[in-house]
Amino acid sequence: MFYTYYYTSPIGKITLASNGTHLTGLWMEGQKYFPSHLPADKTTTLLSVFRQTQEWLDAYFKGENPDYLPNIELKDTPFRVAVWEILKHIPYGETVTYKDIAKEVARQNNRQSMSAQAIGGAVGHNPVSIIIPCHRVIGSNGSLTGYAGGIERKIALLKLEGIDTGKFTLPPSKDTKNPLR
């Protein structure tokens, strides 16, 4: 069975997905790579994993750093899952670069190097946004490049965590509104 639940957040409607025991997806409305269709199965009660996720999100959007993760099940290629596991360990209120993650993946696989672009592809397809904090990943030049939920949401999440976004830059095509300040 496949279940969905909708959570209303300060950054818009969020869709949660579960297999009944684990969180399998968390997408913001209009997010890039949002599933084109979700199965029709619905839950008539608030599943335990949805309650756990809702509590996590409630705390997070109050500016708190939840000290646990909901039960999450990640299924994809071994490469993507490895990248998402690394993302889970980026501390609240901190950022890392795609290059940093590439170095860590290379280290874990006894390789000399790894493409930061390949890392970007995996980060961009993270199925559990916010909780697996892909919004904390930036370009090595300080650019807030790429976020499937949109640059404005990435900035809002970083600010919520107390990060000074004024020190970052926007990709050239996104620099019209300057939402960093």
Name each model-derived stretch:
Residues M1-T24:
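DNA-contacting interfaces and partner/effector-binding or oligomerization modules
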Residues T15-L16, G25, T97, G146:
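A sequence-level detector of short linear motifs
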Residues Y3-P10, E55, E64-R181:
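Nucleic acid-binding interface residues in structured DNA/RNA-binding domains
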Residues G12, M28-Q31, K75:
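Histidine- and/or cysteine-centered catalytic micro-motif in compact active-site loops
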Residues S18-L69:
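Compact structured core domains
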